[in-house]
Amino acid sequence: MNLEKNREVMIENQLRPNKITNNDVLQVFMSTSKEKFISEDKKNICYSDQDISIKDQRGYLKNLHLAQILHFAEIKNNEKVLHIGGLTGYLSVLIAKLCNKIYVTDNDQEFVENIINNFKNNEVTNGKVIKEEFSEGLKGEEPYDLIIIDCPQYNFNLDLLSQVNVGGRIIYIEKINEELSKAYKMIKYQDNFSKVFLFDVFSNFYLTKQEERFNF
C-alpha cells in the first residue's frame, strides 16, 4: 500500500475540488502522515472519504471537513491557538504547522500522552498539551486568537468567548441530531459576537453526551 500516493490522491480528489486551494493548508496535509496517528487496522482507510473512529464516540472527521476547518480558520503564523479535544494529535499537528503557538487539551490521559508523543515525532516545538475538561477551554494562557473544537458537540459553552481576543475566532461544530451537525465560525467584537454557518457535517461523533433536560 502506497500511503504517500494515497495522500496525494486525497488532496487532489477530496480537497482541491471542494475549494481547498490555500497552498499552506494543502502543504500541511501533504507533509503530515495521518497513518501514524491511528491504529494499524485503520491505516488502509485513513485517506479515504470517511470518518475514522478512534475511541468511544470520538474520532477524526473526514479529511475534507478537517481541511474546511483550517480553511475557514484562516490561521496566521503569528497567532496563538487553543485546540480543544486533540485526540491523538493529527489535527493539532496540522494547526501547529500554521500558527505561532498551540495549546491542546483533552480530558483523556491516554490521548494527552499520544499528543505529546506525536508532537515529538513530528518535531512540533511550539505546542503544549494539557489534560482539561472540554467545556473549560484553557484558563491561564488566554487570550487566544483562535479556538478550534473539531468534534461535534451538543452543548457549546459561550463563556469560551471570554478566552479569545477582540477579533478572535472560534470554530466549532454544533450537533443537531444523531446524524447531522453544523459547523460555525464565531468572531468576537468589543461588546458582542457574530456567528456564521460554514458547512454541514454528517457524523455520529460527539464530544460529550447530551445533557438531559427535564420539563416540569
Q: Which functions belong to the PLM regions below?
A:
Residues M1-L94, L98, E110-T125, Y189-Q210:
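Class I SAM-dependent transferase core
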Residues E74-S194:
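Conserved nucleotide-cofactor-binding alpha/beta core module
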